[in-house]
Curated annotation (Swiss-Prot):
GO molecular function list: structural constituent of ribosome
Similarity comment: Belongs to the bacterial ribosomal protein bL17 family.
Keyword Transcription regulation: no
Name of the protein in its database record: Large ribosomal subunit protein bL17
Organism: Acetivibrio thermocellus (strain ATCC 27405 / DSM 1237 / JCM 9322 / NBRC 103400 / NCIMB 10682 / NRRL B-4536 / VPI 7372) (Clostridium thermocellum)
Cellular component GO terms held in the UniProt record: cytosolic large ribosomal subunit
HAMAP family for the chain: Ribosomal_bL17 (MF_01368)
Length: 174
């Protein structure tokens, strides 16, 4: 018996389809697809969520110095004129240094994040901003399932598809 369903496609196409379905599931919370694809996506999604739940709180915080340009009331950079050694004048942007707290992944969480990212595509929202689905998985989805042992997804049968009568299902995060 094969480890994964073949889905009637070559390996590269099959992985691309599964990767896009897993990405859509984590981005939207639910997907509508055929039963065979849904069973494969469910298997992959359950494993990724289990990894994220295990490594959910495995990070440290550290202080980082951040340099940023000073802005005036209109949002423009504040500049000063300086003279070089040979007498030329040039503009220099004023900068301010702040210290911010930044989260740093521990090695096992970093490995888990990279495993998860291997199954997710980069996606953008309607305004064109990039959404980091790995962050969403570790920061929003995994904490909801902290006390749950498996069963993170649910499948509903919605009947056969018109045209080829393939059994269609809705796969959603519980």
């Amino acid at each position: 018996m094969p480890a994964q369903r073949k889905l009637g496609r070559p390996t590269d196409q099959r992985k691309a389809v599964l990767k896009s379905l897993v990405t859509a599931l984590f981005q939207n919370g639910k997907i509508e697809t055929t039963e065979a694809k849904a069973k494969e996506v469910k298997n992959i999604a359950e494993k990724l969520i289990a990894i994220a739940v295990k490594e959910c709180d495995n990070f440290t915080s550290k202080q980082v110095k951040v340099s940023a340009a000073k802005l005036d009331s209109k949002g423009n950079k504040i500049t000063n004129t300086k003279k070089s050694k040979n007498g030329n004048e040039y503009l220099v942007v004023e900068r301010e240094i702040k210290t911010d707290m930044q989260r740093v992944d521990n090695p096992s969480r970093l490995h888990a994040r990279r495993k998860v990212m291997s199954w997710l595509y980069r996606v953008k929202d309607s305004e064109g901003n990039t959404i980091n689905l790995a962050n969403k998985l570790f920061d929003e989805i995994a904490p909801k399932y902290r006390d749950v042992q498996g069963g993170y997804t649910r499948m509903y049968r919605i009947g056969p598809r018109k045209g080829d009568a393939a059994e269609m299902v809705i796969l959603q995060l519980v």
